[in-house]
Amino acid sequence: MEKLAVLYAEHIATLQQRTRTICEQEGLEGLVIHSGQAKRQFLDDMYYPFKVNPHFKAWLPVIDNPHCWIVVNGSDKPKLIFYRPIDFWHKVPDEPRDFWAEYFDIELLLQPDQVEKLLPYDKAKFAYIGEYLEVAQALGFSIMNPEPVLNYIHYHRAYKTQYELECLRNANRIAVDGHKAARDAFFNGGSEFDIQQAYLMATRQSENEMPYGNIVALNENCAILHYTHFEPKAPQTHNSFLIDAGANFNGYAADITRTYDFKKQGEFADLVNAMTAHQIELGKSLKPGLLYGDLHIDCHNRIAQLLSDFDIVKLPAAEIVERQITSTFFPHGLGHHLGAQVHDVGGFMRDETGAHQAPPEGHPFLRCTRLIEKNQVFTIEPGLYFIDSLLGDLAQTDNKQFINWEKVEAFKPFGGIRIEDNIIVHEDSLENMTRNLLLD
């Protein structure tokens, strides 16, 4: 924690400088950032799990407290309005005394509707940053989520401070503990539900604390890209296991994926090993000055090579790419920025005005197309799947004649493969946070 405290000072200074620059540029007196508020379920007295405004948690590691506000102008000490009610029904957050508290002038808020007297009186040149526009309007804000401000902040959030990088390393440490426990639970014959519980136990984080819904898939379920069901019964036969799961540290996310063959031998195990080798090489290809979209193209070339090498498609790799067959087996992007959000912002931006960096032709669904630069953090997550609906579409095209349908049927019980690491780009080196923690 001592290291984080030292790095946090520089982090706050960086956020202050960014705020000062954009406020001067847009003629604003400051930003008022709202943590959010609890959402009640329809016709009920229960609330959905609270998810904090990412602009709020970028300033401080308070991710579980609604009705908080930050008032910041980039020059003066930021003001934190911290919600701390008198409440015998729920746990009340402790008064802030952590390493970050000294960087804020803190005022306690007893009731959400009492916040107006703690906010700037004249709000004409203050911009509200948050989700609840009706609340902002009721409080007298006329400037809400201005696009030039958001574009500027989103663009610069791709450049992580040293504090943020340390938080991401810690998130990876926690997640890797979970992945190792989940792997062991799979090889011990566990169900998807059993594996999920093993993961949560190892990370010491609840399901609601995870940065996204864990994907814990066995056998054919590995072909469902965003599979978030947890089957309580173990299958009669364990073939394969795909886990896409992260962890949270101070509001920053890990996002890691692994795929395993239960028997650790046979053609699917060989395919997993081959994909892992390609994934590692793709990770090593991250270099300042390259466009991330170009790595996505390289990934398709590598997927085509796998399809050819394993006789799934009876064509040389170059022709598989030319005929656009790879998108049937690899229908998503190579990866994305990672930070305070799992799919972190700024991935499509060419500059701080928000100018769009177009994806490569024929690849419209990427989550990142940006120029790679130092202090950025990326996921690298190639995949190869046997998805019934996409294979059905392929079977209606002229390309069906080149598919080894017998081989496809043999692989279907395994569902698919995805391998994902979290990588920091430094000026003259790469830091694979995930593999540095010895997750195979």
Curated annotation (Swiss-Prot):
Note accompanying the cofactor annotation: Binds 2 manganese ions per monomer.
Keywords: Detoxification, Dipeptidase, Hydrolase, Manganese, Metal-binding, Metalloprotease, Protease
GO MF annotation, one: diisopropyl-fluorophosphatase activity
Residues passing through the membrane, by range: none
Pfam families in alphabetical order: PepQ_N, Peptidase_M24
Post-translational modification: The N-terminus is blocked.
Thermal effects: Optimum temperature is 40 degrees Celsius.
E.C. numbers: 3.4.13.9, 3.8.2.2
pH dependence: Optimum pH is 7.5.
Cofactor: Mn(2+)
Domain of life: Bacteria
Positions annotated to bind Mn(2+) 2: D244, D255, E420
Binding locations of Mn(2+) 1: D255, H336, E381, E420
NCBIfam families: PRK13607.1
Alphabetical list of HAMAP family matching this protein: X_Pro_dipeptid
Name of the molecule in the record: Xaa-Pro dipeptidase
Protein's organism: Pseudoalteromonas haloplanktis (Alteromonas haloplanktis)
